[in-house]
Amino acid sequence: MKLFKAMLCSVAALSLLLPAAHAQAAPTVVKIALTQPTGHPTTDLIRGQFKKTIEEKTNGRFRIDVFDNYSFGNFEAVVQGLQFGMLQFAQESPSNLSIYDPKLMIFDLPYLMPDYDAVNILLDGKVGKELSRSLEKIGIKGMGWIALGTRFYWMNKPFHTMAEAKSMKIRATASKVHISMTKAFGMNPTPMAWSETFTALQQGTVAGVDVDIHSAVSANLHEVAPHLVLSGHF
């Protein structure tokens, strides 16, 4: 089992969230862009407890503005927002970020990790720290990792063997490893943004997508791809 990971990125130092020495006339706005909608555990945590804690502990000196479900903009807009200071934090998939450093494609290797403990050992150690620094060359600092869960295939029609899935169009990320893995499974990878996936499944542009359960349900993918294949490959 390999766990789908998200990377929390920032252009700000951790000290940004510490109380200012003097009260300000207006709060400093901290903008956070998230990939998932309200209803997803990660989004609800940041919209709820994280926002409340920061604003209370700083006595209102900081205000947390959350842009969920790519409402700030697409992947490119989020990266540029971090680089130019329009965003202070963002959650993003290593698969997408791998275009800036191929080492991040390690997360697209299927069946690499046996369980959560193995993932935590990897990311809390030397490898995780090195990967967190991989985006500094483009002005982005990796702040930490979020486990979104194990990936399964969500399909608009069922299949029981890989032979039945042959040539089915599957939504893929921009990662070359993810695309190659999908081809190795005998499927036809179709790279597209996560925000376009629901419509693509609804219109039949793709037959399925591999994603964790929380992300699928919060995005209502089960409405257009009701057949769950328990592959557990990521």
Regions flagged by a language model, labelled:
Residues 9-19:
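Bacterial N-terminal signal peptides
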Residues 24-118, 126-234:
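N-terminal secretory/targeting leader peptides
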Residues 1-10:
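Bacterial N-terminal signal peptides that target proteins for export
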Residues 2, 17-24:
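Intrinsic low-complexity, intrinsically disordered segments enriched in polar/basic residues
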